[in-house]
Amino acid sequence: MTGETRKERSKWDTKGPPDIVEISEDESLPMNMDDHKKGNDDHRKGSDLLPSQDFGHGNDKQIGESLNLKSTVSMHHGSAGHEQDRADGLNKDIKERSSKASSERLPLRMGDEDHNKNDWHNRGFEKAAGNQGMSRYADDRRRGDGWGTTLSRGYSSRISSSGPDAWKRSRSPLSPRGGWNRSRRNRSRSRSRSRSIGRGRGRSRSRSRSPYFSDRGSEWRVERSRSSGGPALPCRDFVAGRCRRGSNCRFPHEDGVRRQFDEHYPVDSREKYGHQNRDFMDPREQDDYLRNRPPRGGHYDEGTWERSEPRREYRSTMPCHDFVKGRCSRGANCRYVHDDSTPHGGWRDEVRDNAIGRSGPDSSYGNRTEHRRTNKNPCKFFANGGCRRGQNCPYLHEEASQSQMGLGAPDEPGYTGGPTTRGDYLSWSEQNNSVQASSHVLSRDDRENPVPQGTGRNDSRYENKNRHSKDAGSSQYQIFPQDDFGSVGQNKPEIAASQLPQFIPSVQTGTESINIDKVSDMGGQSGPGTVGNLSMQIGMHSANLLGGHNLGQKAESQDAISQISAAPSLPGATQLQNTTSSVPLNSQVQQSDFSLHPNRQDQFAVPHATTNNSAPSMQSQPVAPYMGHSQHGYIMGAQSLPDLSVHNGQIFNVGQVPQNLPTIVHAGQNQATSDTPNLGRDSGDQGLQNTHNFQPVAPNEQTQSQTLQGLSVVASSSSVDMAGAPLSHNAVSSQEEVRRVTASLAQYFVPSLTADTSGLQSSQPDPNSSLMNNSSAAPQAVQPNHWPWLQQAGMVQPSHIVPPEQPAPQTFQAPMAAGSSNGNPLLLPHSVAPTVPAAALATNETTPAENKKEEPKDTDAEANEDGENKKSKDSKALKMFKLALADFVKDALKPTWKEGQMSREVHKTIVKKVVDKVTTTVENTPQTKEKIDIYMSYSREKLNKLVQAYVGKYAKKD
């Protein structure tokens, strides 16, 4: 029997692989059940035989089962040799198994359970004699060390699949562990032959009670895989959210959720290639969609997916781009850094900016992350007060100072109406109690469309001037460098400290407009001129600072000033006893500190400065009226100011401050004529005068008067840095030099001059101020229209006087013109007009100048030629002006003409009368079409009144 048993064993050794397949198969249960019945019948027939015979019957049953399985498999593949390869390849499918669809795993698990119930228990108890087959299967499970289970499960999954495709998928080995499993299986099979029958029976019985798909959890599989030396791979299906095995899954589930974030993101194609590809699609967008999409299996919120704290070894230092975009749903479980300060690409800034632009600064997206401003340019929307981005705006939200904004502030959009500066400044209303006056600045580009610019806005320069006027002493003449507003009283000589009469510059026109006049750019021969920002504070006690002292010269950085051709400018040559002041400016403008020294107890003499000639172009801007602390911002041309108490005898007492400041005082060889604009033509108020109205605030105190000549008052709102200039007595009164200078100036100012005017028509001076001239009994005045550049010894005419009690608007004129004396260009400053009521303006407009003196003596032939050219140009300009007036009068007469209330002759008469009246009154004819349009726009009301007056006069006669 032993020989037969060995023979039978050696006989079935060649068919060993079918034994393994027979025990592992899942879907061959009907065939196995038939074989079980047949085996049971054989077992009942041979029940009285020996145990060896029983073993033989068990082998017969095994042979039947093997033959049945072999025949079944042979129908598909044809030979048992292929079955051996297929069985070997099943061990190699451990890595393919986890990536299969979930539809293959559910039947697998159910098939395994049926296999455990039917096959294992039935065979374990019905075939007690078949211990060899059981021992072989037990040996396979024991020597698998975790991999035998894979063999059984993998084979079962292939059998559960339909057709030979499942076998074909398992043909190609993907892992080098196949040969290792095959060698271990062969050694285990050889060892199983030498084991005893009882041991095999007991082992098979014990194994049958605990099938390989027990509910012992996944820990034992992890331990077995680690003990066998294999890596503990995470469950990919659990990471993808579709693992249905739960605790029975052989792969670990802990921290598997973090595996999907281990891969580094690819380089953004937008950052790599720019925006060249229109069909750009960010691969991270697809990852975000897959990452944030809930899985179909419903395991998104199960178990370890909602872990509150991820493992620290999976933490990455890379920023979470989902959090930057504002859509990271992982919260604290995200392994990437949730930090707003981490650097990121520029396209994320675009996403953020676009989102902020759509939703506004108060949205949750805008508040979630803090935007970093890397751009140093100011935000123009913030200057207008309408930036919707708020703190997320990449541009600076700090209002730039006017020096940074440049000189063309009126032309820059958004400069007015914006928020005030953030500095700790005092408001004008608290410091000065001044009346807020709005003004219009007319530049070359927007003369027809004036930009309203409030003078009451908080400007750092003006506020600092007001604040420094209190600190620097109340009785002194000071010059504040425009770059030294932060330091008070630096390089400013204090003359005395006491209460002072406060002078108020009148700054407003009848039409609330400030005209920036023409500046001619001339080539100069000598050094740069000096322009000072004169802050006038007159006190009782003052030190006697003689002319010629350098008072706080401070050279500052020099800014180029753009030349502006704006409102028309008219020459006003006021030459007192053949003395003129040259007020030169170079492209390098400097600022100087001036101080007035007392001449005697009741008088102040303005020390003069020796200056060099240059060719500037300068822009003037409005200066707010300072009514509280008498801190006046002027730009005083660093002029050659002679002591007029000696040369001209012009003395201004305290109660009698000069109305008409002489605009020209000559020093040395430099003679010039000042270019005074015609406010009547530019703003429609012909009666506005170019005079400075000083109103003393404390007239009862013992004060001193000053001798002022050649003081040019210019608005100091431009960002011009100026340096100091020495003050010295250099007065020259030469009749010959005056004639030569006036002749040479004609060639530059022919378009803006008229040959038939030589006197000065005075405006309404302040009764509190009078000009005492030793050489002429009449006080000086400035004519609003043309005034002659040929005047050599000025006899000035008095004019209407308006009491200061009338709250009339005031004008601030900023005209400039450049002249030349022997090739030396000169900057001619302006004066400021007083407040004049509308009635006085209308009267002064229609009233011709009285007692006008002419100085026609000019021996230069060059002047005569220039006069002829001037007349020809004036005739063309006058013709254009008359045509414009005629059109205007015709439009005004249309309603009356259509109603038939006047005849054709009356219509023509009215048109002719109005045109003649205006042209004879307005001697300074506008030269260009733009200037004519400006005049017509500002003079519309007055012209209408004049037309209606003639209509009432001539229509009644008909």
From Swiss-Prot:
Q: Where are the zinc fingers (C3H1-type)?
A: 229-256, 314-341, 373-400
Q: Which UniProt key words apply to this protein?
A: DNA-binding, Metal-binding, Repeat, Zinc, Zinc-finger
Q: Ribosomal protein as a keyword?
A: no
Q: Which InterPro entries does the UniProt record give?
A: Zinc_finger_CCCH (IPR052650), Znf-CCCH_4 (IPR041367), Znf_CCCH (IPR000571), Znf_CCCH_sf (IPR036855)
Would I find DNA-binding among this entry's keywords?
yes
Q: Output compositional bias ranges, type Low complexity.
A: 152-163, 832-843
Q: Which residues form the signal peptide?
A: none
> What's this protein's name?
Zinc finger CCCH domain-containing protein 55
Question: What organism is listed for this UniProt entry?
Answer: Oryza sativa subsp. japonica (Rice)
Lineage start: Eukaryota, Viridiplantae, Streptophyta, Embryophyta, Tracheophyta
